[in-house]
Swiss-Prot record:
It is found in: Cytoplasm. It comes from the Bacteria. One of its GO terms (cellular component) is cytoplasm. Induction: In response to low temperature and salt stress. Its main location: cytoplasm. This is SPbeta prophage-derived stress response protein SCP1. Keywords: Cytoplasm, Stress response.
């Protein structure tokens, strides 16, 4: 389905845990959100009013696919910090040390 300037996008404004401008920033990370596209809130309706990028406007299918990827990325487990990894290793060393000492 085509996504057009002038379209009421209220039905897809909240899409897979993100709002539409967040999804567009995910799709076009080098964009200027305040310039490259524009939405207007018209009495609770979200109207897509401008697209100033050289790339074609993404289709609704592309937007939905990107929204799903963004949702998965947001829900992905965060990598452990160095301190957390060191603490885990210290626990493993303590456990293995107790096992070795217990066999002697």
């Amino acid at each position: 389905m085509e996504f057009k300037v002038g379209q009421d996008v209220s039905e897809i404004w909240n899409i897979h845990g993100s709002i539409l401008p967040e999804v567009l920033m995910y799709m076009f990370p080098r964009s200027d959100e305040s310039y490259d596209w524009e939405f207007v809130n018209d009495n609770g309706r979200h109207i897509f009013t401008a697209w100033r990028k050289s790339e074609p406007i993404p289709t609704l299918e592309e937007i939905e696919k990107a929204a799903i990827e963004l949702e998965e990325k947001k829900n992905a487990p965060k990598p452990k910090t160095l301190e957390e990894r060191v603490a885990d290793l210290e626990k493993q060393v303590a456990y293995l040390t107790s096992k070795v000492e217990g066999t002697n």
